[in-house]
């Protein structure tokens, strides 16, 4: 369909002899020739495979096949495309991606309200605090950024300028966003802020000291939020004068790419504060997911067992590239070893130690946290002490160059390899060892009412960890695979590797 005004304009130009002469069609003819299509299609498949493997996402390859076969013949291509679409729309990938779309719309619906505020103060200009401040300033908020030293603030402003150059289209947009991002060494911005976000290191005593000082300056109607990734809000709120206006806003790294933010509640929070927090996240184009205060909340509670199991395999001599390749073959955007480097080994250590202390089985078996976590490996502590923290320092479990992990590709499988079947079994077990503890932790969070329902779990894990979207989320994956099959696999792993794989009691509610 063509808008009417364009038709009138074309007629007027034709009458006035202003229409441009059509260019020669020989480049188009050459482009659509069979040899050219074959060469270009091969290149398209190669480039697409780097982002979307054909076994997981068949649609882009079907489109390339159509163009290679019918390019230049519009009628034949259209007819073939209808048949191709009809075939693809009923695949599990298509059905699950449609589900993911509606999960996202559901989360967006939580942020529909209008946030009345316009001023934000961020305490802590490190990787998370600085990037939260930069993202909010880009979305039109006036943001003051404080820290105890000027160097982190300067570094955050520099990172913001680099980010704005990547996502901005106009120099005026970049200039205005930088103008809205205000260095604030003394913390004066706290007094006028509608929302104060604390993004300090994961130390309970430090955070509580920050709150005590901030509350003395904050407006009575302002909201205080913590970006803690693991500490329970019941501990953090001790000593607060207005605990009803205290919440968790757990962003994920990198802030500019990760859409999910966990909105963490506790039993004394004002419901209006939660509503305002959701609206704030809508203002900055982020997806809120409501979670109840508990160690690790949802995403880290589920992610830590996945990463710890990878560390155990690493200790057993499995190459890190092989571990990551197994996770990526399942559909994860990156493997757990690379993810640990991406997040930062210091953050991994802090969260793992905290969760290991908090998630202890009780003597009577009735404690809400029943699954033991593996011990934190000594080498992880040693790397953190040496400052080998991953991507941000250029070295962690991988060497990093130009923002990418330097990997040795795993050896390619040979078709005539007599041990090929055994290797496939090993790969399947390796994948289950990483993925199923993550799924089991999601079941535990559902049983413990950390989250309200399965849809919240699946949406949060897809948008917070990148859990294979074409699988529809961890709990949807478990239902598709078959809950009895998952339970049998967990029991088999528990018999072979230990109690950490014993299925959570919450599986009975799903079954």
PLM regions: where:
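N-terminal glycine-rich phosphate-binding loop for ADP-containing cofactors
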Residues: 1-511
């Amino acid at each position: 369909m063509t808008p009417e005004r364009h038709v009138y304009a074309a007629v007027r130009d034709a009458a006035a002899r202003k229409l441009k002469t059509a260019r020669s069609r020989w480049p188009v003819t050459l482009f659509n020739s069979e040899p050219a299509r074959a060469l270009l299609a091969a290149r398209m498949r190669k480039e697409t495979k780097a982002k979307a493997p054909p076994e997981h996402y068949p649609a882009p390859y079907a489109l390339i096949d159509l163009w290679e076969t019918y390019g230049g013949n519009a009628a034949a291509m259209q007819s073939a495309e209808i048949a191709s679409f009809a075939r693809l729309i009923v695949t599990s990938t298509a059905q699950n991606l449609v589900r993911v779309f509606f999960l996202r719309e559901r989360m967006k619906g939580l942020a529909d309200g209008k946030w009345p505020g316009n001023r934000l103060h961020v305490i802590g200009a490190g990787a998370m605090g600085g990037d939260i401040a930069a993202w909010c300033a880009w979305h039109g908020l006036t943001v003051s950024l404080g820290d105890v030293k000027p160097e982190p603030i300067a570094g955050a402003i520099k990172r913001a300028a680099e980010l704005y150059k990547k996502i901005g289209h106009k120099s005026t947009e970049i200039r205005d966003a930088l103008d809205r991002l205000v260095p604030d060494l003394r913390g004066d911005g706290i007094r006028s802020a509608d929302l104060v976000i604390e993004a300090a290191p994961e130390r309970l005593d430090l955070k509580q000291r920050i709150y005590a000082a901030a509350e003395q300056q904050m407006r009575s109607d302002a909201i205080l939020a913590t970006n803690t990734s693991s500490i329970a809000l019941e501990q953090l709120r001790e000593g607060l004068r207005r605990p009803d206006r205290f919440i968790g806003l757990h962003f994920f790294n990198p802030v500019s790419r990760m859409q999910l933010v966990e909105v963490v509640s506790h039993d004394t929070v004002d419901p209006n504060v939660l509503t305002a927090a959701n609206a704030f996240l809508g203002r900055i184009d982020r997806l809120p997911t409501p979670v109840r205060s508990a160690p690790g909340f949802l995403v880290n509670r589920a992610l830590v067992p996945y990463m710890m199991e990878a560390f155990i395999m690493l200790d057993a001599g499995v190459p890190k590239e092989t571990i990551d390749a197994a996770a990526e073959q399942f559909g994860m955007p990156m493997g757990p070893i690379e993810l640990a480097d991406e997040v930062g080994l210091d953050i991994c250590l802090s969260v793992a130690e905290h969760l290991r202390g908090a998630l202890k089985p009780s003597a009577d078996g009735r404690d809400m946290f029943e699954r033991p976590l593996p011990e934190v490996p000594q080498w992880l502590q040693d790397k953190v002490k040496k400052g080998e923290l991953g991507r941000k320092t250029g070295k962690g479990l991988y060497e990093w160059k130009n923002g990418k992990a330097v990997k040795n590709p795993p050896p390619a499988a040979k078709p005539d390899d007599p041990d090929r079947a055994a290797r496939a079994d090993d790969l399947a077990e390796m994948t289950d060892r990483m993925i199923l503890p993550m799924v089991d932790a999601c079941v535990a969070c559902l049983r413990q009412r950390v989250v309200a329902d399965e849809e919240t779990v699946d949406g949060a894990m897809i948008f917070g960890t990148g859990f294979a979207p074409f699988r529809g989320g961890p709990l949807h994956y478990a239902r598709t695979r078959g809950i009895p099959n998952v339970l049998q696999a967990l029991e088999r792993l528990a018999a072979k590797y230990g109690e950490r794989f014993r299925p959570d009691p919450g599986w009975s509610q799903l079954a």
